[in-house]
Amino acid sequence: MNLKSIQFSRKTSGILASLLVGFSLTLTSCNDDDNPNTTPTPGSSTITDLVVASDQFTFLEAAVVKAGLTTTLSGTGPFTVFAPTDDAFRAAGFADAAAVSAAPDTTLRRILLYHVVGGSYPASAIPAGQTALPTSLSVNGTTYVSKATSTSGTGVSVNGARVITADVQATNGVVHAIDRVLMPPTGNVLQVAQADTSLSLLGAAVARGGAAVVTALSGATPLTVFAPTNAAFRATPYNTVAAINAAPVAALTAILTNHVVVNPGRAFSPTIVSGPITTFGTGSVTATVGSGNALTLLSPGNGGQVSTVLQNTTGVQNRDITATNGVIHKIDRVLLP
C-alpha cells in the first residue's frame, strides 16, 4: 500500500520521554503552507502567557478563559499543547473571539483538553509514523500524531491537523500551532456515520449489508472509511432507502467493503500519498494527491471517473473525522469495485 508509513504505538510517555534529551528540531515541510516554523530556544513564559501574548491565538485565549484553564496551563506541567490558530477557529465556524466566549464552557473545556498532552514533546522527539498520545480528556481522549517524510521534507500532523509552527517553548512545556481545531470523537465509525445526516444513505446501506459490515464498523480494529455522501449515492441505482433495501445484500456488501481500509487503520489525509490502497478483502482503489491538499480516488468499477475526498469547509468537517476506532473521509462518488 502506498501510504506513508504509519506505525501505531500506545507506548507514549515511556518511549517519547527517552527521546527528549539532546534533541533539537530541524523540521522542513512539504510546502511553504505546511512548513513548521520552529523556536527551539527555551522560553521564559508559561503556556498561558504565550497564548495571551500571541496575536494568532486570540480565539484560543478566549476559549481558555471561558473554559477555566488559565491556571492549569500556567501550572507546573509539563504540557504539550496543540494550539489552534485564529484561522483554525474560524474554519471551525467561530466568527470571532466573542463567538468562542459565547460557547458553553463545558463544551470548550472538553475540546481544549483534547489539545493538551501531559509531558513536553518537541516535534523532533516524535517518532516517524503514527503515535498514539493520550490527552487530558479522560473519555475518548487519545490523539494520533503522525510524522511523515517525503522527498521534499518532513511534516507533522495530529488527527490530520497540520503543525504549522512547531516547538514554541514555554517554562512549563511546548506549544505546536495547528491549522484545525481537533474535535474529540463522539463514538465509533458506525455511530459517527449514523449521526451525520449527510451520510444517511450510507447508514441505510450498512444496515442492509448485514451483521458483518456493522460489526466491522463498530468493532475494536482501527479502520479508515471513505464515506460516500447522500449526493454520491443518489448518482447510483442505490439512490433511495427503498432502492437500497431492495438491493442484493451481497452486492451492497461488496461495494461497502471497497470503501474500508484496515491497514493502516487510521489513514489521516496528510499521510496518504499517490498510489494503490488495498481495501477490505481483496479490493483496491488508487489515490492521487494534488496541489492544495486535493485528494481523489479511482476504483475499477467507476469507468475512469474519480471520487473526490471532500475538503473541509467553514463549520463543516469532511475529512479526518475522528472516531474511537478509526477515521472517516467523505467522498463525492461511490467507489464501485
Where does each model-flagged region fall?
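Mature, structured domains of secreted/extracytosolic soluble proteins
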Residues: 2-19, 23-337
